[in-house]
């Protein structure tokens, strides 16, 4: 199987949209790798998995799935037969019966992590000041302005629904461990990555490396593609 025959599906997390992957897409496409960003409604975990499955239905051939943050739970809940590997970009990986909230809050939060609470509509928004403080502290001011402008809230239902048997038990996985992450502390990332038996790639990046360190992200995705292409 040639590298160019593998498609990459990129899945955004909370407070973001598909544009957060734009720099990664540029790097993958520049290497002849087709990449598609899957849009999520962020209304419930079930809704998000259904949306991802609709994107996967449109793709022929083998797929490497990459998810950022909350989207780790989404890619782990997909079960399309053409998924050959998973890439967790400082992402949450609940095990069977666990919720996103349980793994997110399993450790003491970083001192600069924002306090999160739903509004009257059951939606959780990221405060503006949290973008430079914790979400993407390595980003340039122009990048932060865009991240704030396009943020999409996540519904409480997304983080309270237990997951089924995760796909990472059945296909190989890679984990970008963000050592400077202030949203999902590194200890929590390592706990999840080790129990997944993932190939762990630690880097001194923040919570949103798709924006602030896209080459690092693209290189790890390419490693996953190469592994499934030659095995």
Task: Label the model's feature ranges.
Residues 3, 58-61, 169, 224-230:
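Glycine-rich phosphate-binding loop signature in dinucleotide/nucleotide-binding domains
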Residues 146-167:
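Active-site nucleophile elbow and catalytic-triad environment of alpha/beta-hydrolase enzymes
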Residues 179-204, 208-211, 216, 223-224:
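Conserved loop-alpha-helix segment in the C-terminal half of the alpha/beta-hydrolase fold
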């Amino acid at each position: 199987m040639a590298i160019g025959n593998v498609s990459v599906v990129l899945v955004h997390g909370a407070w973001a949209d598909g544009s957060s992957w734009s720099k990664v897409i540029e790097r993958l496409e520049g290497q002849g790798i087709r990449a598609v960003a899957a849009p999520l409604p962020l209304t419930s975990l079930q809704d998000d998995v259904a949306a991802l499955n609709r994107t996967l239905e449109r793709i022929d051939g083998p797929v490497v799935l990459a998810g950022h943050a909350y989207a780790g739970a989404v890619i782990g809940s997909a079960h399309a037969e053409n998924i050959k590997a998973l890439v967790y970009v400082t992402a949450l990986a609940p095990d069977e019966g666990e919720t996103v909230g349980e793994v997110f809050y399993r450790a003491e939060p970083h001192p600069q992590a924002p306090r999160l609470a739903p509004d009257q509509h059951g939606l959780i928004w990221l405060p503006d000041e949290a973008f430079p403080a914790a979400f993407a502290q390595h980003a340039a001011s122009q990048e932060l302005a865009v991240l704030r402008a396009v943020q999409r809230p996540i519904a409480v239902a997304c983080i309270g629904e237990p997951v089924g048997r995760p796909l990472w038990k059945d296909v190989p996985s890679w984990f970008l461990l963000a050592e400077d992450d202030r949203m999902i502390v590194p200890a929590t990332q390592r706990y999840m990555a080790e129990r997944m038996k993932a190939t762990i790639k630690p880097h001194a990046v923040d919570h949103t490396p798709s924006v602030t360190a896209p080459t690092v992200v693209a290189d790890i995705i390419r490693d996953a593609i190469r592994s499934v292409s030659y095995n």
